[in-house]
Amino acid sequence: MRNPLVAGIARAIASVGLYALRFNFRGVGLSAGEWTGGLAEVDDLDLAIADARALAGGLPLALSGFSFGAVTTLRWLAQGGRADAVALAGVPLRSATFQPEQLPPVPDGTFIVAAELDQFGTAAELRAAYPRARIVALTGVDHFFGEKRNEVGVLIAEQIAQDLRLD
């Protein structure tokens, strides 16, 4: 997993005293399998969560995802998955070809860090689409958050800690 934003989120989560697991979906990097555009990747997430739960015993589960990982997290939740906290970044309303994404519902209260200038769905568009989500907008950045990548990790880690009552 070489995405600097995802790596920063994992570091920030670990910095508040939580375990952080990040992984490549099938067909990405050195992972086996073939990418399916989000269909079978929900199974990858389910297996990663099962492994994390096995390692962590009864500790609470918090999920975070960026872009494709955020959509996959939402799909997993829509299929009945449960987490104690959910904090996402860069939730795309449009695909890489700028076609509308068919997103599953965003559970009420989901925390989302959005980019004001996100080419796949601005903060304003996300607020209109998901009025019951807790959305924090970072100004002056696009989908990849540029120089505000570290801020994304801090916001997510702090929110997860608060949601899990760790602060």
Role assignments for model-derived ranges:
Residues M1-N24:
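Short, surface-exposed "cap/lid" segments of acyl-processing enzymes
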Residues L5, E34-L55:
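Alpha/beta-hydrolase active-site loop
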Residues A32-G33, V141-G153:
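Catalytic histidine-centered segment of alpha/beta-hydrolase-like enzymes
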Residues P105-P107, F111-A114, D118:
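Short beta-strand/loop motif that positions the catalytic acidic residue
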Residues Q119-E125:
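Conserved alpha/beta-hydrolase "acid-adjacent" motif
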Residues E147-D167:
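Catalytic active-site module of serine/aspartate enzymes centered on a nucleophile-bearing elbow/loop
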